[in-house]
Curated annotation (Swiss-Prot):
InterPro entries: RNase_HII (IPR022898), RNase_HII/HIII (IPR001352), RNase_HII/HIII_dom (IPR024567), RNaseH-like_sf (IPR012337), RNaseH_sf (IPR036397)
Superkingdom of this protein's organism: Bacteria
Name of the featured protein: Ribonuclease HII
Biological source species: Pelotomaculum thermopropionicum (strain DSM 13744 / JCM 10971 / SI)
Entry function: Endonuclease that specifically degrades the RNA of RNA-DNA hybrids.
Species lineage: Bacteria, Bacillati, Bacillota, Clostridia, Eubacteriales
Gene: rnhB
Length: 266
């Protein structure tokens, strides 16, 4: 099967992943050429990695599969991003994934464990694979008026209500969502335990980061595009120098300690 091919031709074929069935791999294993042996070892390593990733993804569906087996379908995962920053809104997302683990979502994980480029890549894939997804936002004013916990729940509630498919059950990171008549399970560390919650955490984080990049254009002196509103030394120094702007959370102590909001209005 491969004896009539050069090592370069086999390498090109392996790179394209075309026709890489078990017969092809067995033929590579029997080929005595050193170059072919190296190609075979690389393909087997890749195969083993994909098998391990498929197993890891399947474990992330334990909660979803259990609920579906009990008759709850579809299941939505819900999470938020932006509880801790000194500036900007809190953003939530709700995601309904297909009931079967999909290697198109290889690398799916808690958004905090992924770098920005990986999060953006996965967010695009999640939107393609998901049966439904949506986002909800609570503004800086709502955070001030309600407190951050209540505002986070409001953002999550909005995300759920915007889903085009009504979920039968919710898996929520951290806390149950009040004033929502749907059965739900709050999972501590849910973005590392549930595929749909992990997907929601990624969408919420990517959307919020993009909003903060947009706000950076309006208020470049704070560096929102770098720290996304969190209390980094750069951000605290900018607050001390310029005072708060309308995006800052007036109820947060570091913001209150930096003087009048009027310094940066407009």
């Amino acid at each position: 099967m491969v004896s009539g091919l050069t090592v370069a031709e086999i390498r090109k074929l392996a790179g394209s992943r075309a026709g890489l069935d078990e017969d092809f791999l067995r033929a590579l294993a029997c080929d005595k050429r050193a170059g072919v042996a190296e190609i075979y070892r690389r393909l087997k390593r890749d195969e083993n990695k994909m098998a391990a990733e498929a197993e890891r993804l399947q474990k992330l569906y334990i909660y979803e599969n259990s609920l579906i087996a009990q008759g709850y379908s579809p299941v939505a995962g819900v999470d938020e991003a932006g509880r801790g920053p000194l500036a900007g809104p809190v953003v939530a997302a709700a995601v309904i994934l297909p009931p079967v683990a999909d290697l198109a979502l290889a690398g799916l994980n808690d958004s905090k464990k992924l770098n920005p480029s990986k999060r953006a890549e996965l967010a695009a894939r999640i939107k393609k694979v998901a049966l439904a997804w949506s986002a909800g936002i609570s503004t800086v004013e709502e955070i001030f008026n309600e407190n951050i916990h209540a505002a986070s729940l409001t953002a999550m509630r909005r995300a759920v209500l915007k889903l085009k498919i009504r979920p039968a059950y919710l898996l929520v990171d951290g806390y149950r969502i009040s004033r929502l008549e749907l059965p739900q399970l709050a999972l501590t560390g849910g973005d590392g335990l549930s595929a749909s919650v992990a997907a929601a955490s990624i969408l919420a984080k990517v959307l919020r980061d993009r909003l903060m990049d947009f706000y950076h254009v309006q208020y470049p002196q704070y560096g929102f595009n770098r720290h996304k509103g969190y209390a980094t030394p750069e951000h605290l120094a900018a607050l001390e120098r310029y005072g708060p702007c309308p995006l800052h959370r007036a109820g947060y102590r570091p913001v209150k300690n930096c003087g009048s909001r009027q310094k940066c209005e407009g």
